[in-house]
């Protein structure tokens, strides 16, 4: 079983470029263009994780259009500090600097140009059961 988030982007082609450059995601699978010729569906992968994206149309709103974020993604990576440096260099808006958490992860938070919040983490210690 797995979960595949579906994120909404006004500029799907721009999201593909940014997410690749900043977060290391790779284009995966088929893309689809709308009647206007613009890309309106794509999928990307980070390791074994798949993330799909599409144009929101009139029925839905992405964080940019809504004016706030309603969810975030939490993704485990091998080297969170190296990942942070890449995201920062690529122009991601940094929400949280890398920090160690009480639950045994080192993580940072970033926001993409359309307002989606991404948290990347690395396990640094096994968490203790309560």
Residue ranges and their predicted role:
Residues 1-8, 16-17, 23-78, 82-111, ...:
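Vicinal oxygen chelate
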Residues 114:
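C-terminal catalytic core of tyrosine-transesterase DNA break-rejoin enzymes
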